[in-house]
Amino acid sequence: KSQDYIAAIAQFEQAARDPAYHLRAFGQIGLCYRALGLVPQAVAAFRKACMDYDAPRTQSLSVRYLLGRTLEQLGEKPEALEQYRLIFRTDRTFKDTAVRLSSLEGDQTREAGQPGTHSWRFGQAWKHVRQLLKGNS
């Protein structure tokens, strides 16, 4: 199975040479590295993908989200938080970014020795907004 991922990485690296496939190819390379347990290499691939500023917004947000999740996996919470903030500025409803953002901000607040009431209020407000959007008020 790992041989399949390694072969796929080589194919995606070739595809990444074409600017039209840069973001998607490096996104897939990152996923292959994650599947192989090579998390730092996955982060590097996702970062390369995020450098494609001409990519469609949804694809760009998806890869940035994967970068954030992978950084969280490595314990790089401040960097993950930065990625989620970039996503949130563009699309406040993208996946569970708001929840992750609130959670990581709360973690940072607690690590600084301050109560996390601001993050808790944000989380509660966001929960209420989601309920309103779903029509479950």
Regions found by a protein language model. Give the residues of each.
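Intrinsically disordered, low-complexity, charge-biased linker/tail regions
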Residues: K1-Y21, Q28-L31, A35-Y65, E72-S137
